[in-house]
Amino acid sequence: MYTDTIVAISTPIGEGAIGIVRLSGPEAFEIVDQLFKPFVKGNQKNKQLVYGHIVSGENVVDEVMVVKMAAPHTYTRENIVEINCHGGIIPLREILNLALNNGARLAERGEFTQRAFLNGRIDLTQAESVMDLISAKTKKGYDLALNQLEGYLSKRIKNLRNKLMTLMAQIEVSIDYPEEDIEEITYQQIHDDLLAIETDISVLLKNAQNGKIIREGLKTAIVGKPNVGKSSLMNALLKDSKAIVTEIAGTTRDLIEEFMNIGGIPIKLIDTAGIRDTEDIVEKIGVERSKNVFNEADLVIFMLNAAEPLTEEDLQIMSLVKDRHAVVLINKTDLESQIDENLINETLHDKKIIKTSMELEIGIGEVEKAIQEMVLNNEIVTSESEIVSNTRHIHLLETAYKNVCDAKKAVIDHLPYDFIEVDIKDGILNLGMITGESVEKDLLNNIFSNFCLGK
């Protein structure tokens, strides 16, 4: 348990109806008792909201509602106080400073949740899901984070880890007590147990890409040569004028990123600079960034200008698009067509090709539908509670999967039990790092530093 008491503003800084200053630690009640004067005298009950004033000496700082929550049945398993004041920056900072002057310490980023983890109320996957819950951009992302906060994924990971630990214990008995009258575990039994665990991990990894998209968004790059309508498409999809649209080629010189929601899936839409050879230094940097985004994108929207013949730049981009998940738009179909559609169909025969006109708003709905269909063929679901979505979890799960596969290979090769045990121990370690049962302090600090203050 901690010996110090922390304090932070838990609501966004700015103007609002209500702001919250939160304290947690052994002296939380005593510190607030020095600041809070209730309108009705008497002992404040646990989890009772009480009306009164925060005061500094004889001066009233703000009119507030205060709730005290006694350990261990709190978010951090420590005494917690939440002061509900007016939401302006002045009252919030005044109350924060009073708490600091009376013995509290300013909380680090994510320290309330870190204390909840270190005090055993939640494990590391649940702690990380708190930030996912706050930053969720769609209902599916929110539901996924909520399931993980409830501990569904944790139970699945812990169950896998316990199976490996049980198997390792059986192997160790066979190694350490060969002379005892104990039935020795066989290679076949070890193989069967490892195969079952391998299958369980592979099921989790199968859904991991879906989970990552739900959590982080489908990175979708709009690419094409300059002035084909990329910025117009982005504005049409967002139903807002985020990107500058002009007749001048090369207007977009930097990446423009915005999130949109299609069928409950967060789409990270990226309007790129037109890809072409240029002597303009600033535009050249934008083109290089566009190429990098193209390489990293989950989905590419490739735009062509129907009113012009195919250029060398079009053909160059087309050759890159062939091997990618892509939707092809032949834009400006309101103008007389000069483009070679036969060549496009031959080269990109396996791609969805849509004719559009940003000017007349033709084909926008079809583009949205195509994106939704491209999102893993509509296979993204959140009905399964144990979907893995966090990149850190996925990496550790992949490593644990390799550990189990290596152990199974050692069994097939009839290597000594000591060799098999090494890989099983590594698998236990990696699964434990997901839930926080085996994790280093530096990693914990790195994880919680990504949280907001007051959480």
PLM region spans:
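Short flexible coil/turn linkers enriched for glycine and charged/polar residues
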Residues: G14-E15, G57-V61, H73-E78, G110, ...
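Switch I (G2) and immediately adjacent beta-strands of P-loop GTPase domains
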Residues: Y51-D62, V66-A70, T251-T278, E296-L299
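Inter-motif core of Ras-like GTPase G domains
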Residues: E283-A307
